[in-house]
Every structure is written in structure tokens, then in C-alpha cells.
Amino acid sequence: MKTKDNEVINSESEFSEKDVPNFIEIKKINKTYPDGYVAVKNINFEIKKGEFVTILGPSGCGKTTILKMIGGFELPTSGKILVNKIDIKDLPIQRRPTATVFQDYALFPNMNVEKNIAYGLTEIRKPIENVSADYQKESEKYFNDCLKKSKSKIKDIERKRDGFLKDIQKLENKINNSKILSEVNTMTEEEYEEKIETLEKEYFEKNKKELHKSIPVKVKFIEFINNTLSFFRINKNIDFKANETDELVQTYLKYEKAYRVNLITKQEIDYLNHKAADLDYWVSYWQNYPYQEKEWFDKKKLTRKLTKQEIKEEVQQIIKIIGLEGKEKKWPSDLSGGMQQRVALARALVIKPETLLLDEPLSALDAKVRAQMQQELKNLHKKFGITFILVTHDQEEALTLSDKIIVMSQGKIQQIGTPNEIYDLPANNWVANFIGKANILNATYLKGNKIKLFDNVLNADSRYKDKFKENEEVNVMIRPEDFDVVGKDKGKIKVTVLETTYKGLMWELICEFEGVLLTLEAVNKVNLEQEIYLTWDDEDMHIMKKDDENDTYTDESSEFLALTKNAFKKKIKEIKSKKNKNKVNGKKGDKNDN
């Protein structure tokens, strides 16, 4: 199911656009480190209150960076992190409505389990009982006054920012409306140097002398001044008019002048963009101002810290929920990885955050404990009803736990959807290969919403109607479990079995059809080099654009794939050679029999 903003919602969950507004909105978030490394680029997504969202991707894709920016451990280079429509990206960690469970648990080694869990409660406050109604009114009035001041300040800031944006637009128009400036603007440094070298070479071939020696001293002096101004980042440029009759000299001077003007204009644009970005901080500050001021006011007259007894009761309650009874006095070093994880979860949940951030919390656990903790997380999410944001590289974990999955690669979002959509309807070849196992095959989209695959003309699912051009080359994905091993009369293709692996419930087969490798699952055992027949349902074919730009692998995985394919190609040759020998021997045998 999709919302009007095309946000994908899990059809099995209780969420719908009608009754649950966006709780967290990530808008145009970018993170570039001082060394120039771009961790995430133009990230946008929304999260509903109470959703379990997983950010999934390989190492280095930017998923943990996003989690850290939501939690306040990293500051974005640009963009907004909205919670209930208020930008929190500049708020300190302790003022954010989040709690984080780290990959290494980050338990205090000098505190026992009980004290670790209680630590965050020392700063939690609760309303004072039987408080005067006058204080309540005073608090409300103070908040409204702060809100009024906040709106006025934000209005002034928006006016300033609009001015900066108009100036930026004027400078961009200056470049775009000039043919020579626009041309130079699209050039790289190498391309520009190559253009100048070409002009100098042409001039030398025509006049048998160096070009710069023919340029008047006055022009060269002005060029020297402009270069000096540029070096010291002074946004000024001394204009000059060259009364040169030689066309090559005129062209050279025109490009040099355009380069200088373009450089200065871009510096001005960068400066104005920086000023506009600075204003984002103040918008965020004034949006949060009334709430922080109210919190300060309430601390004095309306709220109090928890008593020792109340803290003890809260700790005992969460210990019972998480399953840590009997471990209260133990030290973190005395606990197993699974138990340490429970303590970290208890410490985060006891403060009742609106959002729980989970940074690959199960990655250090063994398979059995990890499976148990996955179920625990699911139960805790259901019990507390708060928003969970999990970061992981484990596809099975993401598919098992999530209402929504955000798939990332190389700092960009590849797809957002429910587990079913991500698995059955991947957005591109990269997602198809990353999530589970996939057979990605070459096919042709035909008129009448049909697909030509392996010389079979098949009906495509109705969802693909008018999505592709007639006779367009496409990729078709079929998951291993969607193939059925059948008899000859029902089979669409005949394949040769190259490898069999027993997986417990199923056999995994790697087969060959006309040089194409297929991975499939079968209930019954088959023999190596056996020929079997396969079929599949039309709705099991997922059609994608061919040669998608996202269809990339890491060097390590591409090397592995190449080695695997080469090994099977060798095996295919051996099988074919063996078959040919058998045929030849069979014919010889027939002759001998005669």
C-alpha cells in the first residue's frame, strides 16, 4: 500500500496514512567529511510513529552515519531532521527524543546491571502532584510568549534566506545566460587546460611564436592582478578590452576572462550558499526555543526528579520485562553477550524514549542467540509501541523484524518498501542481488504485456503494463524458490545440474541452460549432471530495466562472482565434452554391433 507521498507502508502493520502522520522526516540530508569523503548524499525518507524501520546495506553504505545524525552523534553537512515537524539536527544528544543501543553495548564497566540501567533515570523528571493551577497557567502563558517570539524570529530568518537565494539565482543566471561562461562552467580543470593548450598550439603553428608573447603588456598585467585577487580569494575582477585582430588571440583572451569571471561567480555562490546554510541552524534553534524554555520553566515549578524508590521500581519493572531477574548485582564482564545486550536494551528503554536507535546490536552474537534476540526485539517493539530504527547488514534480520526497509548503497537510497516489496519487487539489479539470491536473466518486453524469455513467450504480470517500450531489452528476476522441477511435458526449459547442496529442508541446485547459470531449490534430491525440466508462474517474474546504473558490486564480490562463473563454465565444458564422447562411443558401438 502507498500513501499519497508514495511512502510504502507494510500492509501487515497497523499503520495507515489516515490515522498516523509522519513522525520523523529526513529531508535532503548530506554528510561530507573534512577530507572530502561523501558519506551520504541527498537522503530523504519518512517514518511513522511506532514503526519498526530498518536501514539495510553493506559496510560503508552510510547507514550508521544516518543513525548517528538522528541520534546527535554526527552533525549533517546540510539538510533537516524533523521530529513532529521540528528540526532537531542541531539539538544536543540529551535533548533529543531518542535512546541508542550501540554495537559494542557501551555498558559502564564500573557499575553493576542495576546501576547501569538506573543511570539515565537520574535526569528524568515527573510532574509534581497537586500543583497550583496558577503555575499551570503561568507555564502555558510563558510557552505561548516564547512561541510568538520564535515565529517572529523564524519569519525574519526566512526573509534573509530568501534574499540570499535570490542573489544565488541571479549569479546562476549570469552563468547560464552567457554561452562562453556556461561552456567554461561545465568544463573540468583538465578540460579547460586542454582547451587553452590547443589554442596555444594552433597559434604557434600559424605564427611560429608563443601566444602569450603577442599579448599586450597591459592585458598581461591585468591578468596578473586578477590571478593575485583570485589567489587571495578576493571576489573582484578587473575587466579589460583587448583590441586584438588575431582571432586565436581573441578566443584565448575570451576563455581566460570567462574562466576568471566564472571562478569568482562560483566563489560568490558558494559564499551565499554557506550563509543560507548557516541560517538553517537558527531556524532549528528558534523552532526548539519555546519547548526548551518551557522545560526550564517547568523544572522550577511543575516537575521534580524521581525519588530513589521510584528509580528502583522503574529498574525492577524493566528488568522483569527484559528478562534480567537474578542478574541485578552482576558486573557487565560477568555476563554473556546476549545478557549484555539485554542490559543495553533495558538501559535505553527505561527512560521511555519516543524512538529507539539500534546500531547493529546483534552482530556480535552467535546465530542461535541472535535469533532469540530478534524475537525479543519484535516483542519489545509490540509491547512498548515506540518507533524502532535498526541499522544492519543482515538481510534476513531486516526482512524478519521490519515494517519498512530502507536499502542503501554507496551513500544513496536504492529502495524503500515493505519486506515483501523489497524481496519480491526490487527496484533494480543491485537490490535484487543484495537481498537474498536472485536469477537475473536477459529478456525482451513484447507487445501486449508479454515477455520473451528463453525462447518462451510468456505473459507478464499486469503491474508491468505500459512500463516498458515494445521490444525493449529488460532484465527478469526469478527467485530460486520460484522454480519448480516438473516432468518433461510441463517444463518450459531443460537444464543440466552442475552442483547440489543439501540445506536441510531443501536442496540447492546450480544448473545450466544454454550457458546461463541458474540457482534453484528442490524438495527431492537430484544427481549431478542430471537433466531436469523447470517451470515457473508468470507472477514470479519481476521485470526491471536492463543494465541499471545501480547494478554494481564491490571489488571483492565481483571477483568472487567471476571465479564462481569461471569454475562453472569449466564444468559445463567438461560435461559437454563427456556427452560428446558418449555419443561418439555410442555410434562406434552401433557399428561394431552391426
UniProtKB/Swiss-Prot annotation:
<keyword id="KW-1003">Cell membrane</keyword>
<comment type="subunit">
    <text>The complex is composed of two ATP-binding proteins (PotA), two transmembrane proteins (PotB and PotC) and a solute-binding protein (PotD).</text>
</comment>
<keyword id="KW-0547">Nucleotide-binding</keyword>
<dbReference type="InterPro" id="IPR017871">
    <property type="entry name" value="ABC_transporter-like_CS"/>
</dbReference>
<protein>
    <recommendedName>
        <fullName>Spermidine/putrescine import ATP-binding protein PotA</fullName>
        <ecNumber>7.6.2.11</ecNumber>
    </recommendedName>
</protein>
<dbReference type="GO" id="GO:0015417">
    <property type="term" value="F:ABC-type polyamine transporter activity"/>
</dbReference>
<keyword id="KW-0813">Transport</keyword>
<keyword id="KW-0067">ATP-binding</keyword>
<dbReference type="InterPro" id="IPR003593">
    <property type="entry name" value="AAA+_ATPase"/>
</dbReference>
<comment type="similarity">
    <text>Belongs to the ABC transporter superfamily. Spermidine/putrescine importer (TC 3.A.1.11.1) family.</text>
</comment>
<feature type="domain" description="ABC transporter">
    <location>
        <begin position="24"/>
        <end position="435"/>
    </location>
</feature>
<dbReference type="InterPro" id="IPR008995">
    <property type="entry name" value="Mo/tungstate-bd_C_term_dom"/>
</dbReference>
<feature type="region of interest" description="Insert">
    <location>
        <begin position="125"/>
        <end position="304"/>
    </location>
</feature>
<dbReference type="GO" id="GO:0016887">
    <property type="term" value="F:ATP hydrolysis activity"/>
</dbReference>
<keyword id="KW-1278">Translocase</keyword>
<dbReference type="InterPro" id="IPR027417">
    <property type="entry name" value="P-loop_NTPase"/>
</dbReference>
<comment type="function">
    <text>Part of the ABC transporter complex PotABCD involved in spermidine/putrescine import. Responsible for energy coupling to the transport system.</text>
</comment>
<dbReference type="InterPro" id="IPR003439">
    <property type="entry name" value="ABC_transporter-like_ATP-bd"/>
</dbReference>
<feature type="binding site">
    <location>
        <begin position="57"/>
        <end position="64"/>
    </location>
    <ligand>
        <name>ATP</name>
    </ligand>
</feature>
<dbReference type="GO" id="GO:0005524">
    <property type="term" value="F:ATP binding"/>
</dbReference>
<dbReference type="InterPro" id="IPR050093">
    <property type="entry name" value="ABC_SmlMolc_Importer"/>
</dbReference>
<dbReference type="Pfam" id="PF00005">
    <property type="entry name" value="ABC_tran"/>
</dbReference>
<dbReference type="GO" id="GO:0005886">
    <property type="term" value="C:plasma membrane"/>
</dbReference>
<keyword id="KW-0472">Membrane</keyword>
